[in-house]
């Protein structure tokens, strides 16, 4: 997309602004229905981006801490319904219904805590997916502007927000109906189904219980609880640079 604008700045000067979007925005124009069975989120990312004509390593990159945590129906060694052996994992269905490629991939990434950004090197806008701070690379230093025509920061603002600080995940797996979640301190049962809890360091009132996030094991529920807590932390304390 290209947004153009012309503004009269006075004193015989005009300001012409052009806003460019990366190639990833073109995926808004591809709207389909699709079903994935037993595929992990990283595998779906690679499949969709390759179908859009993007090449891994050149046009996009996955900087994930451990792709194994996104494996489909990753078991946690728990037996189901008194069984002597762990329950066999059931393939997960991931459905794209009347969604553009970009909306579909963005939704999947947001659910499991994968963010994406763009690097502009070697004349290419590379799309980078990451789930860890080191995936963003070393931060660049910019000085406050000391005069006209110099590159730097003009305005620095910091904003605090009150957010919930305790996050629960609750789900039910009919293949392992005996699973339950207990408080690690008191030992009392919190949910008689799959569950998990994550907290922020900040001590603020408020809690969120998310039901049916499609977690099939306690390990998966714990990962999602941590993701929801990290999302809230990202909104709690923000810096704005201009």
Question: At which residue positions do the language-model features occur?
Answer:
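Amphipathic alpha-helical and helix-coil boundary elements used as assembly
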Residues: 1-242
């Amino acid at each position: 997309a290209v947004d153009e604008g012309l503004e009269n700045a006075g004193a015989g000067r005009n300001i012409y602004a052009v806003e460019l979007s990366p190639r990833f925005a073109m995926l808004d124009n591809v709207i389909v229905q699709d079903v994935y069975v037993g595929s992990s989120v990283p595998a779906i990312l690679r499949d969709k981006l390759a179908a859009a004509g993007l090449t891994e390593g050149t046009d996009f990159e996955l900087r994930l801490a451990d792709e194994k945590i996104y494996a489909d129906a990753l078991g946690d060694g728990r037996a189901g319904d008194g069984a002597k052996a762990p329950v066999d994992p059931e393939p997960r269905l991931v459905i794209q219904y009347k969604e553009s490629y970009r909306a579909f991939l963005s939704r999947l990434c947001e659910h499991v805590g994968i963010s994406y950004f763009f690097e502009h090197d070697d004349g290419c806008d590379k799309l980078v997916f990451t789930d860890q701070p080191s995936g963003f690379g070393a931060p660049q230093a910019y000085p406050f502007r000391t005069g006209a025509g110099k590159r730097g920061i003009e305005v620095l603002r910091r904003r605090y927000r009150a957010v919930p600080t305790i996050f629960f995940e609750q789900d039910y797996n009919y293949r392992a109906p005996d699973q339950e979640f207990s408080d690690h301190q008191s030992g009392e049962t919190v949910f008689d189904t799959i569950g998990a809890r994550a907290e922020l360091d900040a001590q603020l009132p408020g809690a969120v219980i998310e039901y049916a996030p499609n977690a099939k094991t306690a390990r998966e529920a714990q990962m999602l609880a941590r993701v929801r807590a990290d999302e809230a932390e990202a909104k709690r304390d923000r810096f704005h640079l201009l």
